[in-house]
């Protein structure tokens, strides 16, 4: 995988650099800017040194991509590389059409097809991770007032088994269950049961100067996003009620930040749906009197299109 084996075929890195405008746009959706030279340097010189099997020509093998992402988001981590591996992960998951045009076929052990089991169909839900990426980790000082009880959990979703697609014609898919990306909130394998109630806002055991409990914020992980995406395979246009119900639950339990919302937009909505959400949301901005705002500067202040300066402060 990843080798330009015949004339006209490009490696994953070459293909992504050839279509770097897409990479740059995806980064822009997170409010970040990227550089093609920096991406090439990371792919050819930095990530191969992580010891997880990353080839210098790049790869679309999700296991390897997730392993690199785990290191980048780890402790101490590589904050300057976060946006690059995040967008690379998005491309690995979404597989835009230009990958096929470049001849970048899915890795035999990386393209996962989720198939419902005939017996006891319930989807596994991955637990939360105990650590957070250093890039956007911060302490939040909250009131000592107890949180309202969480809403009743939704009905169990069908269980899925991760079936590895065999791209070799005539062979049966490998039915072994793929382990989860390394950066899960508990380090357990995919499908393993973990402790419940692991929410992003977690008490640290310390208190601030006023005596209020100090909590640490933990952003979404790849596992969180995969679970939510797999639980709602239909697009927002096809099943808006399902997606809205999921978002209501996520906002209630996770209190997502601006960065988290960008992750949710990219995971649960198509490009067209994202643009529609942004457009309609800006139309719904109201002032303190409940009157619709038309001043673009005020709209931008309340509904920023790019990552605001106060994020992560």
Swiss-Prot record:
Disulfide bonds: none annotated. Residues 113-135, 167-197, 280-313 are annotated as: Disordered. InterPro entries: G_retro_matrix (IPR000840), G_retro_matrix_sf (IPR036946), Gag_P30 (IPR003036), Retrov_capsid_N (IPR008919), Retroviral_Gag-Pol_poly (IPR050462), Retrovr_matrix (IPR010999). GO terms for cellular component: host cell plasma membrane; membrane; viral nucleocapsid. It comes from Avian spleen necrosis virus. GO terms for biological process: viral budding via host ESCRT complex. One of its GO terms (molecular function) is RNA binding. A lipid is attached at residue 2 (N-myristoyl glycine). The keyword RNA-binding applies. This is Gag polyprotein. The keyword Glycoprotein does not apply. Residues 172-183 have a biased composition (Polar residues). A motif (PTAP/PSAP motif) lies at residues 127-130.
